[in-house]
């Protein structure tokens, strides 16, 4: 692995400082060009470096931090459900903000991938799309949540529209769950991909929440089609005509 000096442009990487830029050498038959580019980007990502310094399990933690700094929807004393929680970055951030503890956990996460234990977090190792998952989440939390978070995304195929549709489906399922369980005035945050097929989802969110925002935090890579839908202040008294998104 070759290291060269590169000047950063500020942010988490430092303000106008110099850092070592790491290049990955290609050995015949060992790594593709696209994989090498991804690895170089990952190794030189200032958010990746900062996550190690701050003890977060992923750079995604900063996406939630940045969104909350702007909209301040996470507060001390809230109850949180985190869908697609692996490797645990969002659970770490939300748990710290709401003051969750092992004695009185306020955060419940779920993922089919294993997540190592986190202080103040109850983690369910199961697929959220399983029919038993919604009730198990509520049972684990012991009450309705104030906030439902979802950073779920389907494995990418490389085909932009296919990836968008698959991730929007997960967002729809997460939204339906949120509409079913949130406390009055609760909030919903979920990952989506830009692609134009989320009109039904947006209509439903606007009918059931006071405000809905499209958010692309600085920690989301500029070239990524990723964005987040933030729905604030759940209108619990709104009558839902039907369950639009089925598990």
Swiss-Prot record:
Catalytic residues of the enzyme: 191 (proton acceptor)
Keywords, sorted A to Z: Cytoplasm, Methyltransferase, rRNA processing, S-adenosyl-L-methionine, Transferase
SUPFAM superfamilies reported in the protein's UniProt record: S-adenosyl-L-methionine-dependent methyltransferases
GO CC annotation: cytoplasm
EC number: 2.1.1.166
Family statement drawn from the similarity comment of this UniProt entry: Belongs to the class I-like SAM-binding methyltransferase superfamily. RNA methyltransferase RlmE family.
Protein name: Ribosomal RNA large subunit methyltransferase E
Species of provenance: Bartonella henselae (strain ATCC 49882 / DSM 28221 / CCUG 30454 / Houston 1)
